[in-house]
């Protein structure tokens, strides 16, 4: 399971011109799910994301987590995080989990976050979305539950 975690001032997702999710200060998470992912990957990434100390304290040090600041989180499914561009010029998405199986793991991930964070918004799994991200910093962290980078 992979995530691009961005510290944001605000973020929102639109589908067919309608805002379906929005947040204020917090994290925008683009989430990719692979064919090998399990509930253990969900647990690992959830704990890592909500406890990442990427928010500034009173001394402007990155010492506070999303939980510490009571921030919001928006989670957007993005299978393209498993795009393999090592051969040719067109990405291969063969490692990405698709369809119903990916939707189930995505929803389990969202539910696990909702148990910890007050304001959780999402995109629409499988939809063509417009994602608006107002970065803060910018601070962008790449995470992989298989620790490949």
Swiss-Prot record:
GO terms (BP aspect): D-amino acid catabolic process
Keyword Hydrolase: yes
Main location: cytoplasm
GO terms of molecular function: D-tyrosyl-tRNA(Tyr) deacylase activity; Gly-tRNA(Ala) deacylase activity; Ser(Gly)-tRNA(Ala) hydrolase activity; tRNA binding
Keywords, in A-Z order: Cytoplasm, Hydrolase, RNA-binding, tRNA-binding
Chain ranges for the short sequence motif Gly-cisPro motif, important for rejection of L-amino acids as given in the UniProt record: 137-138
CDD domains: Dtyr_deacylase (cd00563)
InterPro entries, sorted: Daa-tRNA_deacyls_DTD, DTD-like_sf
Broad enzyme group: hydrolase
Organism domain of life: Bacteria
Pfam families: Tyr_Deacylase
Protein EC: 3.1.1.96
GO cellular component, one term: cytoplasm
Catalytic activity: glycyl-tRNA(Ala) + H2O = tRNA(Ala) + glycine + H(+); a D-aminoacyl-tRNA + H2O = a tRNA + a D-alpha-amino acid + H(+)
Compartments reported by the entry: Cytoplasm
Family (UniProt): Belongs to the DTD family.
NCBIfam families noted in UniProt: D-aminoacyl-tRNA deacylase
Role, per record: An aminoacyl-tRNA editing enzyme that deacylates mischarged D-aminoacyl-tRNAs. Also deacylates mischarged glycyl-tRNA(Ala), protecting cells against glycine mischarging by AlaRS. Acts via tRNA-based rather than protein-based catalysis; rejects L-amino acids rather than detecting D-amino acids in the active site. By recycling D-aminoacyl-tRNA to D-amino acids and free tRNA molecules, this enzyme counteracts the toxicity associated with the formation of D-aminoacyl-tRNA entities in vivo and helps enforce protein L-homochirality.
Domain notes: A Gly-cisPro motif from one monomer fits into the active site of the other monomer to allow specific chiral rejection of L-amino acids.
Oligomer status and interactors: Homodimer.
Protein name: D-aminoacyl-tRNA deacylase
Organism: Clostridium botulinum (strain 657 / Type Ba4)
């Amino acid at each position: 399971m992979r995530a691009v975690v961005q510290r944001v001032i605000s973020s929102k997702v639109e589908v067919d011109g309608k805002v379906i999710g929005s947040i204020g200060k917090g994290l925008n998470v683009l989430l990719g799910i692979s064919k090998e992912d399990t509930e253990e990957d969900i647990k690992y990434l959830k704990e890592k994301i909500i406890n990442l100390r990427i928010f500034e304290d009173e001394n402007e040090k990155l010492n506070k987590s999303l939980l510490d600041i009571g921030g919001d989180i928006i989670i957007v499914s993005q299978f393209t995080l498993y795009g393999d561009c090592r051969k040719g010029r067109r990405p291969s998405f063969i490692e990405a989990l698709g369809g119903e199986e990916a939707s189930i793991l995505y929803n389990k991930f969202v539910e696990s976050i909702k148990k910890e964070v007050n304001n959780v918004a999402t995109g629409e799994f499988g939809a063509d979305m417009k994602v608006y991200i107002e970065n803060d910093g910018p601070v962008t962290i790449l995470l992989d539950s298989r620790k490949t980078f």
